[in-house]
From Swiss-Prot:
The gene is tolB. This is Tol-Pal system protein TolB. The lineage of its organism: Bacteria, Pseudomonadati, Pseudomonadota, Gammaproteobacteria, Enterobacterales. Keywords: Cell cycle, Cell division, Periplasm, Signal. Residues 1-34 form the signal peptide. It comes from Blochmanniella pennsylvanica (strain BPEN). One of its GO terms (biological process) is cell division. SUPFAM superfamilies: TolB, N-terminal domain, Tricorn protease N-terminal domain. It is found in: Periplasm. Part of the Tol-Pal system, which plays a role in outer membrane invagination during cell division and is important for maintaining outer membrane integrity. TolB occupies a key intermediary position in the Tol-Pal system because it communicates directly with both membrane-embedded components, Pal in the outer membrane and TolA in the inner membrane.
Length: 453
């Protein structure tokens, strides 16, 4: 049984879209949520562009000590740093902390090689609502030049999302790329020696605001977001064998999709949200199938005695990348859903699997196995170039950020003594980060779409 807590007060238009995708789904019989995870940078930040995010200033006469104003700036700084594009300067190294644009002295920042800074203010109203404003400033000109600014009015519970939204605006202004800081991730958490050892969670991309949407005594696997961000498909063994289900996030309702004898797995929504691809073994070997989600009609896509699984749609809704051992060892192939024409895509080493196609269809992230190691690899579909991005032992389940800048994956450290955790890596492999948590094993991470409705 679920309790669905929805928004009750009118929010700005931009935040209404966010709020609908962030329903707080809480089990009535689960008294507390997990402690938030946090991101620890492990490689690559020094090569990024320096930027300073000044602690935001409180301008209210009724200062509320329950909110740390510095938290908003720190969230923005962390977002920009996590993007791999920016190196945010620690607060203790700032030459000065201006509170308004007219206080900015460009020569102070020039000495540090910093030409972009962020200023902001927080006004706390008597009704405990908040007005957040920011200025993105170019300090290479004298006087300093405002290149972007905005203001938001929200309740306290939305402050963290406002910070992420500001990060999105700053990131897009400076890079021309849509920010993905308001997105969510889903993953399976296994806690050993627990009555319900398997739980499906959703959280902010950075591990904050974790919410359990399903818990089970039996395994949960392979969560997949719908393109509109309203549903998640996943595999459950609650009935004693594998089943594919789709859960609506705003109601918690779960619909059984397929439950054939044998294996039912690897769900993947088409970009237009009209179809669901998956793998079944009802004929003996694993083959790909597609369901029309409106009619429920199922069509078999591959028809051979090999194992064909892990489908990932191309953005054209007409082609699917998948894993097949039809050549002897697992490799990545592409199949056209209308003609069923098949093309091999990967050639790196002897084994590649678990493909994830970028939202623009220009590259694939996959799992490469070679010489006893399992790494995340990238296949450039424009040039055919293949490259290893990580140096790991058991990296698995890669998921590309919806703006195609980062990859999220699960990993077990090389010493094999620690649990599986989540890690981030930039598309070029230069930036790496570890999402810290003190829970159990985290598996099957998947990134939400860019625009949650």
């Amino acid at each position: 049984m679920y309790l669905i807590i929805k928004k009750t007060h009118k929010l700005p238009h931009w935040l209404q879209k966010v709020s609908l995708s962030i329903m707080l789904i809480i089990f009535l019989w689960k008294p507390a949520l997990l402690a938030d995870m946090h991101i620890e940078i492990t490689c690559g930040v020094n090569a990024a562009h320096p930027i300073a995010v000044i602690p935001f200033t409180c301008v209210s006469n009724q200062y509320n000590k329950s909110i740390s104003i510095e938290d908003i700036a720190s969230i923005i700084a962390a977002d920009l740093r996590n993007s791999s594009k920016f190196n945010t300067i620690p607060v203790e190294y700032l030459p000065h902390k201006p509170t308004k644009v007219s206080d900015v002295i460009p020569t102070f920042w020039e000495k540090l090689g910093i030409n972009i800074i962020v200023l902001g203010t927080v006004h706390i109203n008597y009704d405990e609502s908040y007005i957040i404003s920011y200025h993105l400033i170019d300090t290479s000109s004298n006087p300093a030049l405002i290149i972007s600014e905005n203001q938001y009015s929200v309740e306290k519970k939305w402050l963290r999302y406002v910070a992420h939204a500001i990060s999105n605006e700053i990131f897009e202004k400076l890079t021309g790329i849509k920010g993905a800081f308001c997105t969510r991730i889903a993953y399976v958490l296994r806690i050993h020696n627990d009555h319900y050892p398997y739980e499906l969670y959703i959280s902010d991309y950075d591990g904050h605001n974790q919410i359990s949407i399903c818990r089970s005594t039996e395994p949960l696997m392979s969560p997949a977001w719908s393109p509109d961000g309203k549903k998640i498909a996943y595999v459950t063994f609650a009935s004693g064998h594998s089943e594919l289900v789709i859960q609506a996030l705003n109601t918690g309702l779960v619909n059984n999709i397929v439950s054939f004898p044998g294996h039912n797995g690897a769900p993947s929504f088409s970009p237009d949200c009209k179809k669901l691809a998956f793998s079944l073994s009802k004929t003996g070997s694993l083959n790909l199938y597609i369901m029309d989600l409106e009619s429920g009609e199922i069509t078999q896509l591959t028809k051979n005695r090999n194992n064909n699984t892990e489908p990932s749609w191309f953005p054209d809704n007409q082609n699917i990348a998948y894993t097949s051992d039809q050549g002897g060892s697992p490799q990545i192939y592409k199949i056209n859903v209308k003609t069923t024409e098949i093309q091999r895509l990967s050639w790196l080493h002897t084994s590649n699997q678990n493909p994830n196609v970028s939202s623009d269809g220009t590259f694939i992230i996959m799992v490469n196995r070679h010489q006893g190691k399992q790494n995340i690899a990238k296949l450039n579909l424009l040039t055919g170039q293949e490259e290893i991005l990580t140096d790991t032992l058991l990296a698995d389940s890669p998921s590309i950020a919806p703006n195609n800048t980062m990859v999220l994956y699960s990993n077990i450290n090389k010493d094999l003594t620690t649990k599986s955790n989540l890690e981030l890596i930039s598309i070029d492999g230069h930036f790496k980060a570890h999402i810290q948590g003190d829970q159990g094993d985290i598996r099957f991470p998947t990134w939400s779409p860019l625009h949650l409705e």
